[in-house]
């Protein structure tokens, strides 16, 4: 049935008349797809661009994550796990990095809604946070699919998506009652590595026929920490191993189908994540022996995050098109033992007293999709967003005590510095999915954002898909994307200090203070990609070139703004110079035996990833990565797979940036290495599904060291097993 078509004036009138309704990017339920979709919108068309990957629930079952969804997301093209800088600090708290832009430029969504709990954790002088990121709030068994958007396709999501977007879609309510219980265990062969055990449940069904349905899930997980001496026993370093974590999650979704075309969802989630301390002290990758307090805390909980969120999401289908609306709230309490804020002891636990940082986020969004014909078939999208984030962190804002020191721009007395900071960001965007001629699709877009501190920002984009016959498609995109300053960088109350060794190496003498800066500009990246795809009878191949020209990256300052009353240097967070990230991504699918044996491969080759000022990489990532899997469907009940990942060499920083690094930096590289895994899944009967496997079959282990590129532990051989009981 052909969708209703309208002239351009009529279309604009319909959209403008509806501006007061809010929106969400939340997904429609599978059961409502046929009634909810008008025709392909710009958002849906962008998911066909070369920088987009989809991970299904079936994919997750074949390679189950140990605890964090990042375990499988990292196997997508252009994706790695790394820290937010090349310093090696917090090296085992690796997070999702897309196209070398760093974890802070990866936007995590759950059901289309941004998740920002990691922003409640203090941002260090070197640009790291003591956090596991935001990819561990949903257990693997509750995921319907994961969408990974890289490059220009992610620009529509606004601030924080300069690298890309990870959208975790949870399972929807069903029209008949269903439930499941799942159990998973991962047992490392090396007794110095932590074990994992997880259990969760899911219950879904109708409360009032198809008109009112619900879904409820709960999860509990425990991963033990690595042994305190896992690295010391190998190389003599004090670098800590991977810390453990305890997860407790509960999530409810109530879906009301008011009419076949009008759906209202209410969601609520509560999670608690607590660590099990392994001895990390931010700079434990240096030759700094932990103090007695740190030693005594091994195996204890030293920080915990409480995340609470609710949302109201509306989806409607009208004669003129489709509308979406949403209101969301998220609150994170970050409770942890207090840490130092000065020089080499920054980030080291120095007290047995707990303090709490609180981050609250309010969001409203609205979107309208209207199909019409004006010179060509097209679907116009108009969207609006309003975001307000508020941080209150007394421990971090008041940690540096320089009482008696006069510091222009702030106060040395911690009691005189504000513990709070907030930011409001309002955005409006316009997109159009245009079928210019058969086989040619254009997706122009423009986004305008207004920030209460730095003012306005424009983000234009253009994506193209051009058919070159029945088998080959050329796709390209370019977009200007941005990232707003975080609430620590822009806070007048956030003060860090160093006695001298941590000062920039351009400052010859004296101590340094680093002040927050409310006058920062947003970070900007011009993201470009062009790719070609081939599809024929189940065979598929593609290659994509990408380049991000990055400027205004916010860094700890190197320019002396003035001096304190005792002659110490005053610095502040500043917009730095330029950087460039460039690379190639490829994929190959071969149906060796149709419906029986398939071979999938993807690869990433980084051509450049460096600061144009220092030459240092933005983060430590492999030169190349290859992921391949041979998937065998033995029969209707049994399947098996072999997977192999090859990581290229990893180079450390080569250029000194702070005073105590004036000498030659360690040049130790991580050489190329590979990881092999095997897995099997068996549907025992209608209600019982089993899976088991071995990860890192050939036991290739890496140990974290004091310096160089060895900033993390690569765990060795482990055995996993899981069972799901359905009813």
Residue spans for each PLM region:
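Surface-exposed extracellular loop regions of Gram-negative outer-membrane beta-barrel proteins
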Residues: 274-276, 452-454, 470-528, 545-571, ...
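Acidic, small-polar-rich N-terminal luminal/periplasmic segments of exported/outer-membrane proteins
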Residues: 31-176, 530, 708
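N-terminal Sec signal peptide and the immediately downstream disordered periplasmic leader
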Residues: 1-66, 70-78, 199, 204-205, ...
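Outer membrane beta-barrel strand-and-loop segments of large Gram-negative receptors
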Residues: 351, 361-370, 417, 421, ...
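Gram-negative outer-membrane beta-barrel transporters
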Residues: 182, 435-439, 545-550, 561, ...
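Periplasmic-side early beta-strands and strand-to-turn transitions of outer-membrane beta-barrels
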Residues: 174-297, 552, 649
């Amino acid at each position: 049935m052909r969708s209703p078509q309208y002239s351009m004036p009529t279309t604009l009138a319909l959209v403008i008349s509806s501006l007061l309704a809010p929106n969400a990017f939340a997904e429609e339920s599978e059961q409502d797809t046929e009634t909810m979709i008008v025709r392909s919108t710009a958002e849906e068309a962008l998911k066909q661009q070369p920088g987009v990957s989809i991970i299904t629930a079936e994919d997750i079952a074949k390679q189950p994550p140990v605890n964090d969804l990042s375990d499988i997301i990292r196997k997508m093209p252009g994706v790695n796990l790394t820290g937010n800088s090349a310093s090696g600090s917090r090296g085992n708290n690796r997070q999702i990095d897309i196209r070398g832009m760093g974890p802070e430029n990866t936007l995590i969504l759950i059901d289309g809604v941004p998740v920002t709990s990691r922003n409640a954790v203090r941002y260090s002088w070197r640009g790291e946070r003591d956090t596991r990121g935001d990819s561990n709030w949903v257990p693997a068994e509750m995921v319907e699919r994961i969408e990974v958007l890289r490059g220009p396709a992610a620009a529509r999501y606004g601030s924080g998506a300069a690298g890309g977007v990870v959208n975790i879609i949870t399972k929807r309510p069903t029209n008949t009652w269903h439930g499941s219980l799942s159990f998973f265990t991962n047992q490392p062969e090396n007794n110095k590595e932590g074990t994992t055990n997880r259990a969760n449940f899911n219950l879904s069904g109708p409360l009032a026929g198809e008109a009112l349905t619900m879904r409820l899930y709960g999860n509990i997980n425990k991963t033990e920490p690595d042994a305190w001496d896992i690295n010391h026993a190998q190389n003599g370093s004090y670098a800590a191993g991977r810390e453990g974590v305890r997860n407790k999650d509960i999530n409810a979704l109530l879906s009301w189908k008011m009419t076949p075309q009008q759906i209202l969802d209410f969601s609520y989630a509560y999670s608690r994540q607590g660590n099990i301390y392994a001895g990390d002290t931010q700079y434990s990758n240096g030759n700094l022996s932990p103090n007695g307090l740190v030693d005594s805390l091994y195996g204890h909980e030293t920080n915990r995050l409480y995340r609470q969120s609710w949302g109201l999401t509306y989806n409607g289908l009208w004669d003129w098109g489709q509308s979406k609306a949403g209101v969301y709230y998220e609150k994170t309490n970050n409770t942890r033992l207090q840490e130092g804020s000065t020089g080499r002891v920054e980030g080291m636990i120095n007290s047995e007293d707990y303090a709490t940082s609180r981050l609250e986020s309010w969001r409203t969004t609205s979107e309208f999709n209207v199909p019409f014909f004006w010179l060509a078939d097209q679907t116009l999208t108009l969207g609006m967003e309003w975001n307000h984030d508020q941080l209150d962190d007394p421990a971090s804002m008041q940690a540096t005590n320089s009482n008696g020191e006069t510091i222009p721009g702030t106060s040395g007395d911690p009691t005189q510095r504000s513990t709070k900071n907030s930011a409001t960001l309002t955005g409006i965007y316009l997109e159009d999915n245009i079928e210019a001629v058969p086989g040619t699709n254009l997706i122009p877009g423009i986004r305008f954002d207004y920030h209460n501190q730095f003012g306005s920002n424009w983000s234009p984009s253009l994506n193209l898909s051009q058919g070159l016959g029945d088998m080959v498609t050329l796709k390209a995109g370019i977009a200007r994307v941005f990232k707003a300053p975080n609430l620590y960088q822009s806070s007048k109350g956030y003060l860090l200090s160093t006695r001298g060794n941590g000062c920039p190496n351009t400052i010859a003498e004296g101590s340094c203070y680093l002040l927050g800066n409310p006058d920062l500009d947003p970070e900007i990246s011009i993201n470009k990609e062009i790719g070609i795809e081939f599809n024929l009878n189940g065979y598929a191949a593609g290659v994509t070139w990408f380049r991000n020209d990055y400027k205004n990256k916010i860094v700890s300052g190197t320019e002396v703004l003035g001096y304190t009353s005792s002659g110490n240097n005053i610095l502040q967070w500043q917009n730095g110079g330029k950087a460039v990230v460039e690379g190639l991504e490829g994929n190959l699918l071969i149906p060796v035996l149709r419906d029986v044996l398939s071979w999938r491969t993807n690869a990433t080759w980084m051509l450049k990833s460096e600061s144009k000022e220092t030459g240092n990489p933005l983060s430590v990532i492999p030169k190349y990565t290859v992921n391949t899997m041979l998937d065998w469907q033995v029969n209707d009940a049994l399947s098996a797979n072999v997977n192999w990942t090859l990581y290229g060499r990893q180079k450390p920083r080569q250029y000194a940036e702070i005073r105590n690094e004036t000498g030659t930096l360690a040049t130790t590289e991580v050489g190329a290495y590979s990881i092999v895994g095997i897995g099997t899944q068996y549907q025992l009967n209608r209600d019982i599904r089993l899976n088991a496997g071995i990860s890192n079959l050939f036991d290739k282990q890496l140990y974290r060291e004091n310096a160089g590129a060895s900033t993390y532990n690569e765990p060795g051989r482990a055995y996993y097993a899981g069972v799901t009981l359905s009813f």
